[in-house]
Design a protein with these regions (language model features):
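Edge beta-strands of extracellular beta-sandwich domains
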Residues: 109-117
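Extracellular carbohydrate-recognition regions
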Residues: 121-137
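Short, surface-exposed loop/turn segments at beta-strand-coil junctions that are enriched for proline
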Residues: 88-94
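Extracellular recognition modules
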Residues: 99-103
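Acidic, Ser/Thr/Pro-rich low-complexity intrinsically disordered segments
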Residues: 9, 15-68, 91, 105, ...
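Bacterial N-terminal signal peptides
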Residues: 1-3
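Aromatic sugar-binding surface patches on proteins
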Residues: 76-85
């Protein structure tokens, strides 16, 4: 009796996962400024480059690291690694949604949208504004770039309007990857 034996390389060897982006903080960056952006996601170790769909934006990787999962949030939603990026937006850039792609050693991420500029002046959420007595004054119209620091955080804003004036308040958080 004879036996035939075939040896082959394991064709099912799993390739490393490419980078995946969960969110960028802040969700928006201002025209004509340099802003530090934290890109959170998975498999972001070893990343040395990000690309923008807009040539008026330059992106410089400052560091990559493990990311703590914020209290009460799920790592499957917010990621476990992060990239600190310096984003510089030229003054002549028009407000728009811009796609960022993470270029990693194991492939490229899917594009992630970040807001660039606004048709309204943008201000940052300033603490302490956690109650009506500490409400942060804002103008109308105004775009506010806010951050929820923990699961019980509330941000309160105060503004003046006429009796008959109607307001449209739009929150972009969820559609741009925020854990809010």
């Amino acid at each position: 009796p004879s036996v035939a034996l075939t040896l082959a390389d394991d064709a099912t060897e799993k390739k490393p996962d490419p980078p995946r982006v969960a969110m960028c903080l802040p969700l928006a960056i201002n025209v004509g400024e340099t802003t530090k952006v934290i890109v959170r996601g998975w498999h972001l170790e070893g990343v040395k480059e990000l690309r923008s769909s807009n040539s008026h934006i330059t992106l410089k990787v400052l560091s990559t690291s493990k990311a703590e999962v914020p209290n009460g949030l799920d790592v499957k939603r917010v990621g476990d690694t992060q990239i600190e990026v310096e984003a510089t937006v030229a003054r002549d850039t028009k407000p728009s949604e811009v796609e960022l792609t993470v270029i990693g050693p194991d492939g490229d991420s899917q594009p992630h949208v970040i807001l660039v500029g606004s048709e309204y002046p943008v201000i940052a959420d300033k603490e302490a504004n956690d109650g009506f007595r500490q409400a942060q004054p804002v103008a109308v119209p105004q775009a506010i770039d806010g951050v929820i620091h923990d699961k019980r955080n509330v941000d309160v804003f105060a503004f003046d309007i006429d009796d008959e004036q109607r307001l449209l308040i739009e929150v972009h958080a969820r559609r741009h990857g925020s854990a809010l």
